[in-house]
Amino acid sequence: MTTVYTLVSWLAILGYWLLIAGVTLRILMKRRAVPSAMAWLLIIYILPLVGIIAYLAVGELHLGKRRAERARAMWPSTAKWLNDLKACKHIFAEENSSVAAPLFKLCERRQGIAGVKGNQLQLMTESDDVMQALIRDIQLARHNIEIVFYIWQPGGMADQVAESLMAAARRGIHCRLMLDSAGSVAFFRSPWPELMRNAGIEVVEALKVNLMRVFLRRMDLRQHRKMIMIDNYIAYTGSMNMVDPRYFKQDAGVGQWIDLMARMEGPIATAMGIIYSCDWEIETGKRILPPPPDVNIMPFEQASGHTIHTIASGPGFPEDLIHQALLTAAYSAREYLIMTTPYFVPSDDLLHAICTAAQRGVDVSIILPRKNDSMLVGWASRAFFTELLAAGVKIYQFEGGLLHTKSVLVDGELSLVGTVNLDMRSLWLNFEITLAIDDKGFGADLAAVQDDYISRSRLLDARLWLKRPLWQRVAERLFYFFSPLL
């Protein structure tokens, strides 16, 4: 009996160390950033079982077998659709401004199409204005409405949007609604899904959270896009979820959420439509390619239009493109670079690009919320402040609520707006979308919004920052070490 017990004990110990060695080897063999690999190894060596379970659950990008197969299967038809779109040569920009040209060329090479011109674009900063405009557009819709959001929170004006969407479905408009399972948990627990389906709306719960499948797909891989397309001609995107800020997270202690949305008319809606169709097929297996490009591209006035490129990220889309786009934008800056984000946990490369821009004389400003709804990200963000301040970067802490806007402005001409936070999840994990806009007029509008944010912010004093308590420095470094995992 003692011999059997001893043998079992040795086998258990051997299996334990083989498991640790196997996971270690797997981490080392994966092509990943060194800080991320080191952070995972530290967790596994300090808390082996917890670390191994955590790594297998969220350490690698698992879309899931079924979704991965759909992603592979959809590309032949998607590629053909993109080739057909290229035949509509009159919608594509042939040249760009000097500051935007490198970024637009990068996107064209990696995504297969150039930026589209002739779009009308309106910047919107008030949630009431966004929802009222959206309700009007829904009421005037004639063919189809496609919507995807990370969060849909019932209450306030969000319910009015839901009512207008159901009314559209009842009068024969084809309506599709895709919402992230984790972000929209309150919606899926409410009566709204059943009401919408009964009205004729196709409602899809994207990336369902299922603990039974935690090792088959990453549970923290989320559908983070916010997009609305109407009749393949009107489109919305930006940082705003389908929530009424007056009712959303009022007990979080961070104030009202501050967002930015763009409303567009023109061929950009078709370019966004193909992104939506890919997401829909990955999630449902159903192919819903937009109408042939030569049918739905409307006449436009080229001289008064904006040139826009859509940048999509996530499994099945060009890897690392949004990260490359941000690096390209930072290195293209010659006069000034302004960035706004609620969550700032940049990669080493992006941090270096931002600091280098400041060190070569570019006026660099970063606007962050003073209070954050994520304690982990809030502390991790602070760990980068010393290096940024030393390089000459101006850090503004917004005091008018939770600044949720994600925007970048380069030299007043190249603008990036969308759903992408400057953190690891947005850069390498989630389904995201960013618009790259090459236009001085839009740049002036975005600059005015950013100036308003700055007027409601406090400039971080480098001298006072260096005098902060020791315990804060220790906490910052602790969270900094785990920043590659956030």
From Swiss-Prot:
It comes from Shigella boydii serotype 4 (strain Sb227). Its EC number is 2.7.8.-. This is Cardiolipin synthase A. GO terms for molecular function: cardiolipin synthase activity. The chain crosses the membrane at residues 3-23, 38-58. Gene3D superfamilies: Endonuclease Chain A. SUPFAM superfamilies: Phospholipase D/nuclease (SSF56024). It is found in: Cell inner membrane. InterPro entries: Cardiolipin_synthase, CL_synthase_A, CLS_N, PLD-like_dom, PLipase_D/transphosphatidylase. It is a multi-pass membrane protein. The lineage of its organism: Bacteria, Pseudomonadati, Pseudomonadota, Gammaproteobacteria, Enterobacterales. Keywords: Cell inner membrane, Cell membrane, Lipid biosynthesis, Lipid metabolism, Membrane, Phospholipid biosynthesis, Phospholipid metabolism, Repeat, Transferase, Transmembrane, Transmembrane helix. Catalyzes the reversible phosphatidyl group transfer from one phosphatidylglycerol molecule to another to form cardiolipin (CL) (diphosphatidylglycerol) and glycerol. One of its GO terms (biological process) is cardiolipin biosynthetic process. It catalyses: 2 a 1,2-diacyl-sn-glycero-3-phospho-(1'-sn-glycerol) = a cardiolipin + glycerol.
